[in-house]
Curated annotation (Swiss-Prot):
Changing residue 124 to A/V: Abolishes glutaredoxin activity. Residues 2-89 are annotated as: Prion domain (PrD). Its EC number is 1.8.4.-, 1.11.1.9. Residues 22-76 are annotated as: Disordered. Residues 112-196 form the GST N-terminal domain. Glutathione binds at residues 124, 151, 164-165, 180-181. It comes from Saccharomyces cerevisiae (strain ATCC 204508 / S288c) (Baker's yeast). Residues 22-42 have a biased composition (Polar residues). [URE3] is the prion form of URE2. [URE3] is the result of a conformational change of the cellular URE2 protein that becomes self-propagating and infectious. This conformational change generates a form of URE2 that assembles into amyloid fibrils. [URE3]-aggregates sequester soluble URE2, which then fails to retain GLN3 in the cytoplasm, resulting in GLN3 activation and consequently derepression of genes that are required for utilization of poor nirogen sources. [URE3] can be cured by GdnHCl and by deletion of the molecular chaperone HSP104, which is required for [URE3] propagation. This is Transcriptional regulator URE2. Disulfide bonds: none annotated.
Amino acid sequence: MMNNNGNQVSNLSNALRQVNIGNRNSNTTTDQSNINFEFSTGVNNNNNNNSSSNNNNVQNNNSGRNGSQNNDNENNIKNTLEQHRQQQQAFSDMSHVEYSRITKFFQEQPLEGYTLFSHRSAPNGFKVAIVLSELGFHYNTIFLDFNLGEHRAPEFVSVNPNARVPALIDHGMDNLSIWESGAILLHLVNKYYKETGNPLLWSDDLADQSQINAWLFFQTSGHAPMIGQALHFRYFHSQKIASAVERYTDEVRRVYGVVEMALAERREALVMELDTENAAAYSAGTTPMSQSRFFDYPVWLVGDKLTIADLAFVPWNNVVDRIGINIKIEFPEVYKWTKHMMRRPAVIKALRGE
């Protein structure tokens, strides 16, 4: 772990930029085969022009093709990271930095709605944006510039003492600050439930709430960190450590195996419940369950509806192919589940940074 606040999330953000998480795709709503939305709009034109090449280089890394291009890409990434480290060092003395944009915001912040502090390449920030959009809450997003050290601004550190994104200000609760993505999601659904009486993306049943919490904590503690570490050791660590790449990639696969099994069980229960005329044949194994007209119906981790337990996975599922995992082939239930969520208007809006 890095000692300086924000260095790890900064490196991951640059990592995601350099492996083509940077360009919004206007055709994402109609693409049925590729569920990858592009997060960042803040990359330069050179990165945009080379995005297709960079993406192909990453996908072909395991097969050994395009070796020289892969090496060039990795060298470019290392150079970018070195520049980033130098910038971080230059801004380490906070007395020499004027955070005018952040200071101005805190002097003129709105009185209603929410303010989300995020980064254009931070999956956890988009996780919060998705839930805000799904709940219909009015919010503004400030995408911090880590290269300028905005996450170290004293005003922002007062919102999140860990100096990382996401962080949220609830202006309707006397400018309450919430940090850590899981805590933010729980705050939002509980507030919506209290205000409307509708447990949207949540539940009014204590048992279901406990299960939602379990999956949410599993995502924040096991799913996201493992993908982040796999990305780091695959592309950005100063030394090539094959065992580290293998260890974290295998752990990501293990995590997806847990989710795949849970969704498959939900799928089987749904098909057996709805397709009663063929249930006996499915049970006997004489007819594959995949032939059921209900086989592509959406299933969710908890109960029979979409919750924050499901949505929390979306932005990270969206980048997992960068570590060589094809969820469409390896984890088909996870793929279908993610695809259903990625088609939702609120999810599309949030992932586009709108």
